Structures are given as structure tokens and as C-alpha cells.
């Protein structure tokens, strides 16, 4: 158990008592005093505040301690989609839980800064990612109790315009995704769960036109729990996203590195609205991600 002295002086202190992960008392010192056993840890915050821990998403946190050093990273899976369209669908689907690297410098800094958990998927080059996991940034190994909060969170896919003639077109990528949802490959537990709506399908794309096509895909497969991860312009399809009940994950701030992001609302003073403001006004469920 832990007792936190929140505000006030020695004559008037408000206490917050926590036991087994729950708040058991928030009141004046003399009210909570009887609920605090002698062995409880007492911390005086000197006018500070207590906030719930943050959950990070979108970085390589937990999967790479030094991104530029291969020996300190889980690595990236190369895509075979460029040469053999269906070969990627037959390979094993990686799980982020199997690539977690605990105790690194980045994780320690994140944990000390209030990021207590993270949700990340395996890094990949190509269309197909893997299964993300929700883990504790302060854990030492996967053997620690509650080090992995949820082993299998969602299946991740990326849709992007081809960068050379050897990559499949965006239309081909969408056709393949539609085929996988309609007829999951035999033996693919992951795609069967996604097609039945048991797992979320997180699709990363920065193109507004692709987002519109994903809305049509959701109408075709209403049982699929689709989530869009995008740094592109979403304000023009905000109403459609809300009507289709499609949550989105967006970065708090975007520097427009790609042509696909050119239509974004910059925000004040250039525009009265921001992408986030328009999405929230239309009732879209929005999550904030890290942009690396």
C-alpha cells in the first residue's frame, strides 16, 4: 500500500491511499489515517499531482533500443510481396511479444517520464506487419508478472503507393486485403480472427483516397474491427469515418514529408481548424501516436 500526501501544509493535508492498484481513500489526513497500515510507503508530493500512466504507440519502443544498431534491435522483416504476390500471405505472422527487448535505455527513460505501458507491432518493410502487443515499460523480462499486459492486440497492415516498378500497385494491395478478409488463408489463425472481428485490423496509410476506399471496405465487411493509422488528410472524410464507426490513430504534429500528406489542415494561424479538431467535432474516436 502507498499513501501520497497531495496538497496543503502540515495542518491541512489531503491524502490519497492506494492498495492493490486501486484508490481506497482521497480525503483529509485524519479521515484516511485509519486506512493506512504502518508498513505503507508514504510520499509527500509537496503540491504535486497524481496522473494515470501514459500508453505509447507508434514507435519502436521495446523492440529497438538503438535503432541504428542492428544488434540492439529486433530487426525488420523484408517483404516478398514485390515478386511473389501471395507468398507474404503464407509466411508466419510475427508477434511483437517475441521480439521484446526489456531494460534498455529508451524504455527506462520512457518509464521514468510516466509512460508505463506501450503497444507496438513488429517493424516490417512491405504490406504485411505482424501482431502488436501491450507491455509494461518497467518490466525486466517477459517472465515478470504482468510484463505483457496483452500478448495479441491487433494485426497490422500498411497500404502505400509503390516506390518503383517492382512493387505492386495500390489497387493490387487493396484487392489482396479484400481477398484475405473474404477468404482467410487455411491455417492462418490471425486472418481468421480478423475476418470474424475478434481482433482489430490496423491499417496504416497516409493517402486520403486510400482511407476513402477503406471506408468502402468496412461497409463490405461490417464485422471487421477496422482501425486506421494515418498522418494524412482526414478532415474531408471525418463524417464518413464517424458513420462507419472507424477509429483513427493520428500523430499530434505532422511535418509533411510525403506527397500523400499534402492536404492536411495545418492549424492556426494558417487554418482555423486542425485535423484533430475536425475529427473530434464529427464524433470520430481518435488516438494519438508517436511520429518517428
What is each model feature region?
Residues 1-8, 12-13:
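Single conserved hydrophobic/aromatic residue that forms the stacking wall/gate
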Residues 10, 14-26:
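N-terminal helical capping/dimerization or prosegment-like subdomains
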Residues 21, 47, 58, 110, ...:
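Divalent metal-coordination and catalytic microenvironments
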Residues 28-29, 64-69, 129-132, 261:
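Short, solvent-exposed loop/turn and secondary-structure capping segments
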Residues 84-96, 218-222, 254-263:
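Short, basic, glycine/proline-bearing loop/turn elements
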Residues 97, 107, 116, 120-132, ...:
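Active-site-adjacent C-terminal substructures of enzyme catalytic domains
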Residues 102-225:
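Polyanionic/metal-chelating signatures
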Amino acid at each position: 500500500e502507498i499513501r501520497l500526501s497531495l496538497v496543503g501544509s502540515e495542518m491541512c493535508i489531503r491524502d490519497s491511499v492506494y492498495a492493490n492498484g486501486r484508490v481506497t481513500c482521497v480525503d483529509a489526513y485524519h479521515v484516511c489515517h485509519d486506512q493506512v497500515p504502518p508498513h505503507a510507503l508514504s510520499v509527500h508530493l509537496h503540491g504535486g499531482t497524481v496522473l494515470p500512466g501514459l500508453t505509447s504507440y507508434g514507435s519502436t519502443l521495446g523492440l529497438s533500443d538503438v535503432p541504428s544498431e542492428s544488434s540492439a534491435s529486433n530487426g525488420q522483416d523484408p517483404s516478398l510481396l514485390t515478386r511473389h504476390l501471395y507468398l507474404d500471405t503464407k509466411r508466419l505472422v510475427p508477434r511483437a511479444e517475441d521480439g521484446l527487448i526489456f531494460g534498455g535505455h529508451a524504455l527506462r527513460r520512457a518509464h521514468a517520464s510516466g509512460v508505463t505501458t506501450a503497444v507496438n507491432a513488429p517493424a516490417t518493410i512491405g504490406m504485411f506487419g505482424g501482431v502488436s502487443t501491450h507491455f509494461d515499460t518497467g518490466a525486466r523480462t517477459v517472465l515478470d508478472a504482468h510484463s505483457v499486459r496483452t500478448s495479441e492486440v491487433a494485426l497490422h497492415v500498411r497500404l502505400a503507393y509503390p516506390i518503383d516498378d517492382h512493387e505492386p500497385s495500390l489497387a493490387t494491395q487493396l484487392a489482396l486485403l479484400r481477398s484475405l478478409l473474404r477468404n482467410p488463408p487455411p491455417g492462418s489463425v490471425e486472418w481468421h480472427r480478423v475476418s470474424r472481428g475478434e481482433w482489430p485490423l490496423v491499417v496504416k496509410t497516409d493517402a486520403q483516397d486510400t482511407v476513402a476506399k477503406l471506408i468502402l471496405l468496412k461497409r463490405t465487411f461490417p464485422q471487421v474491427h477496422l482501425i486506421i493509422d494515418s498522418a494524412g488528410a482526414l478532415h474531408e472524410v471525418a463524417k464518413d469515418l464517424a458513420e462507419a464507426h472507424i477509429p483513427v490513430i493520428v500523430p499530434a504534429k505532422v511535418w509533411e514529408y510525403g506527397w500523400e500528406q499534402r492536404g492536411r489542415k495545418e492549424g492556426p494561424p494558417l487554418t482555423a481548424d486542425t485535423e484533430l479538431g475536425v475529427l473530434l467535432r464529427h464524433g470520430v474516436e481518435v488516438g494519438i501516436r508517436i511520429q518517428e
